[in-house]
Amino acid sequence: DAQTAPDVLGRLPIIDKRLIKDRFNDFVSAAFRRAALVEGHTNGSTGAPFAFYMNRRRRDRVRAETLFFGRWTGYRIGEPHVFLRLLFWHPKPVIARLLENQVILEPRGLGSVEIDRLLHRIGRSKAVTLIGYPSVLALLARRRLEAGGSASFPMRSAISIGEILLPGARETIERGFGCPVFERYRATEVGYIAHDCQDHRLHLNVGSLWIELLPPESGTTAAETA
């Protein structure tokens, strides 16, 4: 509970995905039948892809978080949106993308030809929200600014994922696509960790997670938790 969780977190060792993968069965709760759980997969962006399980209540909660935080950006369920991401492993099924009105585009190469092709497909999608790595979004935005932003983009918001959103990149993306930019910190296996609001302040997802702040590469638990 809220009184004891900080003390409990402080006693837990720091682990990584490789350790979980190597000793997977030790981490599976005996309170749930494996057959009744939903299997998920990380995309391998940290170099250690692995499968994990959640119960249906947890899966539905993550979906609810997507809708809740999406409203902060102006997105409404069912509206067309483009997701710029690398497809490391287990891409979302086609039927799921169709139901969500989602277009997934893979940003590879990113020479002038590839950038123009991506911009063309984004414009053709009529998406109201654009999701992607800030470095890629900024690259596309600069290309649009160089071209005078002639193509019509009915963009309502852009969402930065997977990397730190630097102030210069935020400004470039906002100018290039003519919409506000929001930061999203999310992990496939735990859901939403933090999300930007319209005042550009990050809010921790304390409704679903206990979040411990650790010194980088310290190997020890932090003195403070959030």
Where are these regions (language model features)?
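Intrinsically disordered, low-complexity boundary segments flanking structured domains
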Residues: 7-13, 68-71, 89-95, 181, ...
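Short, charge-rich amphipathic segments
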Residues: 46-58, 98-111
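Conserved AMP-binding loop of ANL adenylate-forming enzymes
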Residues: 67-109, 162
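A broad, structure-centric signal for solvent-exposed, well-ordered loop/edge residues
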Residues: 16-22, 27, 91, 112, ...
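Active-site glycine/GP-rich loop and adjacent strand/helix microenvironment
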Residues: 99-226
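Nucleotide 5′-phosphate-binding alpha/beta core
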Residues: 1-41, 47-79, 87, 124-131, ...
